[in-house]
Regions:
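Surface-exposed, interaction-prone regions used to assemble/regulate multi-protein complexes
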Residues: 1-120
């Protein structure tokens, strides 16, 4: 897994078009402070081919999670958002700050973020 740094977030999200119209494939709670999700989306650097992307959240301090059986029902038309404001924050939907992210149906706030690309 590669670390995702705060300075690289904007380019990372642009590369995958915020996972708009992508797929929320899985969510796994490894421990109370470590969580993983798998998303599928189109990669701008690969001529918009579909890939899977695993995100690992370490040092989780707050979260609202969905039941894994309901992930296929998540509306991904707005994609996801990743921001950094002293901590990383992930949310399904268009949110631009930490307080708004907590309005999302699914969000995770953590200290460190890593990712791994794989085949669709």
């Amino acid at each position: 897994m590669k670390p995702l740094l705060a300075k690289d977030l904007a380019a990372f999200m642009q590369r995958f078009n915020n996972f708009k119209d992508g797929e929320f494939r899985s969510l796994e709670v490894i421990s109370p402070t470590i969580m993983k999700i798998i998303l599928a989306g189109q990669d701008e650097t690969r001529a918009f081919d579909w890939i899977s992307l695993e995100l690992e959240f370490n040092g989780v301090s707050d979260a609202r999670l969905l039941d894994s059986a309901k992930l296929h029902l998540v509306n991904m038309s707005e994609g996801i958002n990743l921001i950094y404001d002293r901590n990383f924050a992930f949310a399904v939907g268009e949110y631009n700050n930490l307080s708004n992210i907590k309005d999302s149906a699914c969000y995770i706030v953590c200290r460190d973020l890593k990712y791994k690309e794989s085949r669709f």
